[in-house]
Regions:
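Internal intein/HINT superfamily modules and their associated LAGLIDADG
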Residues: 1-259
Length: 259
């Protein structure tokens, strides 16, 4: 991590000075020019332009230009970000006290086709902590392949992936809402000339009446329903890249300009 900081500083014309303390390493980044009124340090000036200079931990966020980067640049950004407050031990997650930063990290990971869960941990003292957790072994493998972690944690991640090499991925990363059964009952089955009992037989399951329609359906099962009824709309829904998630919170943001 120190080498990465030293190398990055060179891009601003800054020659870093590294000093080993008792149990940590201090990196000094002296300005390459004399600082006077209106003349800022090139690194702090850059951070000001990104609007992330001198923020508290709970105020931090991903600068807007990062979201416009190419996938390989986003991966590099996350690789070094994970080396700060990320974890790869019991699970792969990034921790922060800033909800906005957590949402930004999750959005960047989704750009790389890596799905996450957002958990909030309320502490007895202090602020709520947010954990952006990489969901499931398949996403962990993709995270290790596409992003990784800089430094020692990167080697820990590799060991974690090797140790879980025989773990089979669960394909059910989400469930299509139960409302889709209304389409099956009133469109798919009548068009196919099938009854609900015949559909249950085609799916290799016992007929359970209306109980089947009360819960969400996995993509795998929905795909089999689509095949049994020859419903192309259902087939497209089962294979789409739209992820379904339960709405758990609505937070007002105040008046905003819309277009």
């Amino acid at each position: 991590n120190v080498d990465a900081v030293v190398d990055a500083a060179r891009h601003f014309g800054v020659t870093a000075r590294v000093k080993a303390e008792r149990s940590w390493i201090q990196v000094y980044l002296p300005s390459p020019t004399r600082l006077t009124h209106g003349k800022h340090h090139p690194i702090s000036d850059w951070l000001r332009r990104l609007e992330v200079w001198d923020l508290r931990s709970w105020e931090k966020f991903i600068p807007a230009p990062v979201f416009s980067l190419a996938p390989n640049q986003i991966a590099l950004f996350l690789r070094h970000l994970w080396a700060t407050d990320g974890s790869v031990s019991s699970s792969v997650y990034y921790a922060t006290s800033s909800r906005r930063l957590a949402d930004g990290v999750a959005a960047l990971l989704l750009r790389l086709d890596i799905q996450t869960r957002l958990r909030s941990v309320r502490a007895a003292r202090g602020r709520t902590q947010y954990q952006v957790e990489v969901s499931g072994i398949e996403n962990e493998r993709r995270f290790a392949e596409v992003v990784g972690v800089h430094g020692t944690r990167g080697r820990q991640l590799e060991q974690r992936i090797v140790a879980k090499a025989d773990v089979k991925a669960n394909p059910n990363v989400d469930s299509v809402p139960a409302a889709v059964w209304e389409h099956v009952r009133h469109k798919s089955l009548p068009t196919a000339g099938m009854t609900a009992r015949q559909l249950a037989t085609a799916l290799g399951m016992s007929y359970c009446g209306s109980a089947l329609y009360k819960s969400g359906v996995s993509r795998e099962r929905l795909g089999r329903v689509a095949a049994a009824t020859n419903d192309h709309w259902l087939a497209d829904l089962a294979s789409s890249d739209v992820l379904w998630d339960r709405l758990v919170e609505i937070e007002p943001l105040g008046p905003v300009e819309v277009f």
